[in-house]
Regions:
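Beta-loop-alpha module in the N-terminal Rossmann-like domain of NAD(P)-dependent dehydrogenases
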Residues: 82-139
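Contiguous beta-strand/loop segments that form the cofactor/metal-binding neighborhood of enzyme cores
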Residues: 164-165, 177, 182-346, 350-385, ...
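N-terminal Rossmann-like dinucleotide-binding module
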Residues: 13-79, 157-160, 170, 253
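A contiguous active-site-proximal alpha/beta segment in oxidoreductase catalytic domains
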Residues: 123, 131-210
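Hydrophobic residues in well-ordered beta-strands that form the structural core
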Residues: 39, 103, 126, 151-153, ...
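Short, solvent-exposed turn/loop segments enriched in Gly/Ser/Thr/Pro and often Arg
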Residues: 68, 104-109, 130-132, 137, ...
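N-terminal secretory signal peptides and thylakoid transit peptides that target proteins
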Residues: 1-16
Length: 440
């Protein structure tokens, strides 16, 4: 942000007039200003995020932190004035005029980088999953609220018409009270093999120590074992298919039924090995009910080769089971939400749906929402106040896969399992010396 204008001060004062005793100036850019932005990550999902954010004429990319020189070529071509760093800490220490950042790195660095940025008062667009641990998600949610920062998690479906239709139809009671949900993804971000006993040369231009970040030291393994494309499979760096796709596919469900965190979780299939997430996952959550559900509601997640049982799939009749999606079973009908295909949810199981007319709803631009919210002219639809608890719920399922055939009872207020101390050891993790983060 270039300066704080009288207009921005008046805007904040008006918005906070009813707050008790004191108010403080937000770090938002005034509507007349350009948002000065930095990206953590330069290619892959980071490149996509950069392209979508800079599509706004009101945001300027001024800096990028990327540990691998081989991944900054496009940035140099498209943004010749952008300053490129390798160390995210140096970027945050050097770039004093920033308003905003996106965190689009491997999962294990989402929380640490986002928290360092937030400690500086910067607004954050954070890729899903918001963090790699439940503790990190809770702390980012808390700090975003304390500092009144603009935040958005990168779950673009949240702003899509078909997502919004799921939420509206469920909350309007179109299928009655939701009693059961089954959601799945055919992706298989896992590995049953042991880690290769290799110590390969680090490629020129890659800072392996910075890539590891908060994780423990280990040799580099060539052949795309970790970097750039398979870190999602590894326990210390990714969150498997569940963490990768759960935040997308469970988002409409979580948003629609409004149940918060589960009271219990159980994983039914073999767990991860010492190094890698499982290929196939089946996890059942039980939630206390909400006004949109029966007294309790069960949600089962499947990924890899796991799928809902035949009696559940029978609800959609002759329709093809999508590669990714959800079936929501209500007291007065069924909703089939397709993630990979289909423009709107399909209503089944009742004659009243034959002539049902879908409400008029439009797609929103998830990225533009964020940019305009930073400028003070709008608000985000997936701020950390929403996406933090969503991430916690997803990560609880990831954690549960470590304890197959075990009923885990969760106390969300205390942020711990009440019946399994071994599981509690995975709620929070220690960071490597030199990468500690205040607040985490």
């Amino acid at each position: 942000m270039k300066k704080i204008t009288r207009r921005s001060v008046l805007k904040v004062a008006a918005a906070t007039f009813t707050a008790p005793f004191v108010w403080k100036l937000h770090a938002h850019a005034a509507p007349s200003e350009t948002v000065l932005h930095a990206s953590f990550g330069a290619s892959g999902m980071a490149g996509s995020d950069i392209g979508s954010l800079t599509a706004s004429k009101n945001l300027k990319l001024v800096a990028v932190a990327e540990v691998d020189d081989a991944r900054v070529g496009d940035i140099k071509k498209k943004f010749p004035d952008c300053v490129i760093y390798k160390d995210f800490r140096k970027l945050l220490d050097t770039e004093k005029k920033l308003d905003s950042v996106n965190v689009s790195t491997p999962d294990h660095m989402h929380g640490p980088i986002a928290m360092r940025a937030m400690n500086r008062g910067l607004n954050v667009y954070g890729q899903k999953p918001l963090t790699q641990t439940i503790h990190e998600a809770r702390r980012l949610t808390e700090v975003a609220a304390e500092k009144k920062l603009v935040t958005q998690m990168g779950i673009q479906i949240h702003s899509a018409r078909k997502h919004k239709l799921v939420v509206k139809l469920i909350q309007d009671g179109v299928i009655g009270k939701v009693k059961e949900v089954h959601s799945w993804s055919g992706k298989s971000w896992g590995d049953t093999a042991a880690k290769p006993a290799k110590n390969d040369a680090v490629p020129a231009g890659l800072d392996w120590d910075l890539w590891l970040g908060v994780a423990s030291e280990r040799p580099f393994i060539a052949g795309n074992y970790y970097h750039p494309g398979n870190w999602r499979k590894r326990l210390e760096f990714g969150t498997g298919t569940f963490g990768d796709m759960g935040c997308h596919i469970l988002d409409p469900v979580f948003n629609a039924i409004g149940v918060g965190n589960p009271s219990s979780i159980r994983s039914e299939l073999p767990g991860p090995n010492e190094y890698n997430w499982s290929l196939d996952v089946q996890v059942k959550y039980v939630f206390p009910g909400s006004k949109f559900t029966t007294d309790t509601v069960a949600l089962t997640w499947y990924n890899g080769n796991a799928r809902p049982p035949k009696e559940v799939v029978a609800h959609i009749g002759n329709l093809k089971l999508d590669g990714q999606g959800s079936i929501l079973i209500g007291t007065e009908g069924v909703m089939y939400s397709q993630y990979d295909s289909g423009g709107q949810p399909i209503l089944l199981g009742a004659d009243k749906f034959k002539d049902f007319k879908m409400p008029e709803m439009a797609n929103d631009n998830h990225y533009l929402q964020y940019v305009e919210a930073v400028r003070g002219t709008g608000k985000t639809s997936a701020p950390f106040s929403y996406s933090g608890p969503l991430t916690e719920m997803v990560l609880l399922g990831c954690l549960a896969t470590r304890f197959p055939k075990t009923d885990l009872t969760w106390d969300t207020k205390a942020l711990k399992f009440t019946n399994n101390d071994k599981a509690n050891a995975f709620v929070k993790k220690e960071y490597r010396k030199g990468f500690e983060v205040e607040g985490l």
